[in-house]
Amino acid sequence: MNKIKGGRHKSPVKLFEVRLYNAEANVIVLYGNSMDTSARLSGIVVLSVSSPIRVKNIKLRLSGRSFVCWADESRHASPGNRIRRQVVQILDKSWSFLAPNESAKVIDQGNYEYPFYYELPPDIPDSIEGIPGCHIIYTLTASLERATQPPTNLETALQFRVIRTIPPNSLDLMHSVSVSDIWPLKVNYETSIPSKVYAIGSEIPVNITLYPLLKGLDVGKVTLVLKEYCTLFITSKAYSSTCRKEFKRALVKKTIPGLPMVDDYWQDQIMVKIPDSLGECTQDCDLNCIRVHHKLRLSISLLNPDGHVSELRNSLPLSLVISPVMFGARPTEGVFTGDHNSYVNENILPSYDKHVFDVLWDGIPSENPQLQSGFTTPNLSRRNSSDFGPNSPVNIHSNPVPISGQQPSSPASNSNANFFFGSSPQSMSSEQTDMMSPITSPLAPFSGVTRRAARTRANSASSVFNSQLQPLQTDLLSPLPSPTSSNSRLPRVRSACTLNVQELSKIPPYYEAHSAFTNVLPLDGLPRYEEATRPSSPTESVEIPSNTTTIAPSPVPTIIAPALPSTPAPPLPSHPMATRKSLSSTNLVRRGVR
C-alpha cells in the first residue's frame, strides 16, 4: 500500500505511487534454499500532475532491515543493559530519475512513468512478521523534491514481502514422518503424517494406531499440540559473545475423548488446522537473527486394568511454509487463503514411468516424428502388440501408407519386398504365407511354432543386422529356381528386406533373447540322423547326384546348404574283400605254442 506524505490539499500532483511488475499482492517468491534461485525486482514510479510543476529531482530508495529486541531478565544484567536491541541494514539501493542539476525542471501536465529494476541477491532473508521483538521488512520509498519555498516534498512508500518457499518438486513433499515404538507389556504404537511440509492455513492429517499388549487396556483422551520454537540472536561488538533468547508458543491445541476400536486395535485419523494468519504463526526459517521450527506433540492417555492412568508422549517434526497460491486479500493484510493441496497436485513431478522418456529425448530435434516414434514408443516394444491403427506407418493388413518424409513405394517394388503392402492375407499364396512368421503379425497368438520362428529370426537378424542399417532395398534376393526333383525341397529363408523397421524396434521376451545367443544356423532341409551317421565305405565314395539344385549368388551374407536327397545306401562291391583280423593276445599265444 502506497502512503503519500507531505503536500497540501490542493496539490497539482494527483497520483504518485510505486508499482511492482512481477509481484502478485506485492510478494516476491523465491524457491529452494538461499543459493538456488534469485529474483528480479522491477516496477515503475507513476506520477500524474494536473498542472505544470517545478521539481528538483525524483528519487527512489530500496531499503531492507532486520530488527531484534528483547528484555534481558537475568540477574547479572545491569540496569542500563536490560534491553538488548540490534538493527541491521540488509538492502540499501537508490535511483535518481532526473539528471542532477542545480536548477529546477518543469514537468508539464500529464502522466509519467519511471521504470526501475534490481537483482535481489540469492541469499536475501525472508520477510518476518508476527514474532514479538523481531521483524524483517522491505520498503520502496519514492520522493518528489519540489522547488518551492518553503520546500514541500512528497513521499510515497510501498512495503513488499520476500517469501522463500519449497519448490513443488521437492522430495520433502513426498516423504512421510512416522514414529513407532513398543511400550513393553503395554502397547505397540505408531503415529505418522503423510508429508513433512505443510502450508500455513492448511490441515495436517495425523494417523494414530495402537496395538494393545495388555489385556483390559483402554485408551483415554488424545491431545495434539502444534508448537512453534523461536530463537533470537544478537551479534554485536558491544557483547563478548552472541546473545540468544529462546521461547516457544502453542499455535493449535486439539483434544478428542478417545480412539475408535477397529478389530483388536485402535486406529483413527485426526485433522489439525494450521492458523492462516502470519500474526499467529511464522514460517520455518534459519537466518542470522532468528531461527524458527515447529513440532507436533501428541499425548495419549492409557487406562490400565488396575485403575491408574499412563501417558504416552511423542512428537513429529514438520515444516510450515507459505504456499505461493496463498496470497490473500488486501483488506485483511497478512491473512493467507488458498488451496495448497491442489497446488501440490498440479505442480508435483510425474512418476518415473511417465517422465523418463521426456527426460531422455529432451532437446533432440525431431526431423521425422513418425519414424522416430517407432523406435521410442513403448507400444512397439511389447510382444505381440496390437496397437496398430488404420493410419499406422506399417500395417500388414491395409493399403500402403507413406511415412512422413518418405516417398511412397511403387507397386512393382512392393511386389518383391515381402512387406505385404497392399495385399490382404486372402490374396497371399501359401508359399508367401509360410514365409511370414507368426511373430510378424500383431494379431497372431504366441505358440511353440512362433517360438521356433522367433529363434530362427533372431539368429538371422544377428547376421544381417549391419546391412539393415542401410536403406532397405526391394530386390536383394534373386528368385530361386524350381527344384527338378519332387523329393528335394529348397528351404525358404527370409531376406533382409522382410525384417522391417518395426520388427527391429521390438524388444523380444526373455526366451527369445536367450535363444538368440545360440549358434544354431537358420537352415532347413538338413539330412536325417541315419544318413548323417552312416559310415562311409573305404573303397567307394558316395557321389552327389547331378540333379542337386544350387543356389544363385545373393548379396545377403547368408549361407544356405543344399538339401541332400534321400537315396538308398550304395550296394556293396561284388568281388570279395580281404579281411584282416586283429592280432589279439590269444593269437599270439597260439603262434608261440606252434
UniProtKB/Swiss-Prot annotation:
Annotated positions of the Phosphoserine modification: 584
Ranges annotated as biased composition (Low complexity): 404-417
Record GO cellular component, one term: cytosol
Sample GO molecular function, one term: calcium ion binding
Biased composition annotated in UniProt, kind: Pro residues: 565-574
UniProt keywords, alphabetically: Phosphoprotein
Annotated region (Disordered), positions in chain: 368-417, 531-594
Protein name in UniProt: Arrestin domain-containing protein C584.15c
Organism of this sequence: Schizosaccharomyces pombe (strain 972 / ATCC 24843) (Fission yeast)
